[in-house]
Design a protein with these regions (language model features):
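Bacterial N-terminal signal peptides that target proteins for export
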Residues: 1-12, 16
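C-terminal segment of classical bacterial N-terminal signal peptides
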Residues: 15-25
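Mature extracytoplasmic or organellar-lumen-exposed domains after removal of signal/transit peptides
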Residues: 25-195
Length: 195
């Protein structure tokens, strides 16, 4: 009897073109962490203010980026923060863009170094390479086309070199430190940084 009722319900639903199961939003899991990136988040406001010649607004936008600039200045590239301060003080739009490109390049290198140091931790390494890609995307238009293409390809290679834990082990690939090192070296060379 229950079987007959189920068959009738299914047939009725099919005839009425009703879904048998209520629609549910699909959930997805990503290893990439968006996270706040003050340099990237502040870039648009900074460039908009500079382009409009609103230097007080540029100073405000720069202030929101200051913690990250100070970190770069102290740990990665002495003078990175000062380059921004000097460019804004001189009201020099080209110098502001050059300072941003310098800081973004520093961030790319920093994230790749972090990924290299965490290559055995898939999630951390992948997130760091993805963040390096975000910084690359921000400056790609300002790079010579050959360098931009080389960096883009090398970032793809670096992401692939991180490996993949697979799903329940299926499709698992171990990290490839040699391929990662090669990709990193290509990126640093294209950015004019020392490996």
């Amino acid at each position: 009897m229950i079987r007959l009722v189920l068959i009738l319900l299914i047939a009725a639903a099919a005839l009425a073109e009703l879904p048998l199961i209520a629609a549910q939003p699909a959930l997805a899991y990503s290893y990439a962490a968006a996270g706040a990136e003050p340099l990237l988040d502040g870039r648009e406001a900074l460039f908009a203010a500079v382009t409009a010649g609103k230097w007080d607004e540029a100073k405000t936008a720069l202030a929101a980026m200051q913690v990250d600039l100070d970190y770069l200045d102290q740990n990665e590239d002495k003078g990175a923060a000062q380059a921004f301060a000097d460019a804004v003080a001189a009201q020099d739009a080209k110098a502001v863009m050059a300072a941003f490109n310098r800081a973004a390049s520093d961030e790319i290198v920093r994230r790749l170094n972090g990924a290299r140091d965490n290559l055995k931790d898939y999630q951390s390494a992948k997130v760091l390479v993805v963040k390096a890609q975000r910084f690359y995307t921000a400056i790609a238009g300002d790079l010579p086309p050959d360098a931009a293409k080389l960096i883009s390809n090398a970032l793809t290679q670096a992401l692939d070199a991180v490996g993949n834990p697979g799903v329940f082990g299926v499709g698992q690939r171990q990290p490839d430190p040699g391929a990662f090192a090669s990709a990193r070296a290509d990126i640093l060379k294209a950015l004019g940084k020392t490996p």
